[in-house]
């Protein structure tokens, strides 16, 4: 992998620009990576700031997310992943101080914090074997709403992912 990758994703709804996401991913000396994303969604007046550390297999080690909506901080949470536990600690406008502990039966493969570039990490868990076959990827997310602006707590998730095939050039 390159040492540093950056880019921008434009959000569109019905042909109109509704926001953007700027992201950076850089390799660390230990073989892991750090992913940062700043998401601005004008249609719902939401800004999401995400930073996530990944191990050598792109599994989450820790992550931080802050949401600002309509000029007001909705919440900030820190997710810390241990071999058999996920800890979520934060301060939320709707819930005050929160502290959650979730027992993990296996290492956590996926933590969905809603930047599109982070959502793409689910494809690494799914892999490229058996085109056309759907695999269910278990993980956690911080919100089950499409915009990622509700809840902001650690919630179990299961994502159905199908590898269609390799891109043709």
Task: List each model region and its residues.
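Short beta-strand micro-motifs enriched in acidic
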Residues: 26-28, 53-57, 164
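Non-transmembrane, interaction-prone segments in cytosolic or luminal domains
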Residues: 35-37, 74, 143
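Hydrophobic/aromatic-rich structural module bridging two neighboring secondary-structure elements via a short loop
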Residues: 43-95
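An N-terminal domain-cap segment
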Residues: 14-44
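Residue-level detector of beta-strand structural context in well-folded domains
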Residues: 23-24, 50, 77, 159
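Short beta-strand segments that buttress and anchor functional surface loops
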Residues: 8-13, 35-42, 64-68, 88-90, ...
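Solvent-exposed helix/loop surface patches that form functional interfaces
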Residues: 1-20, 30, 79-167
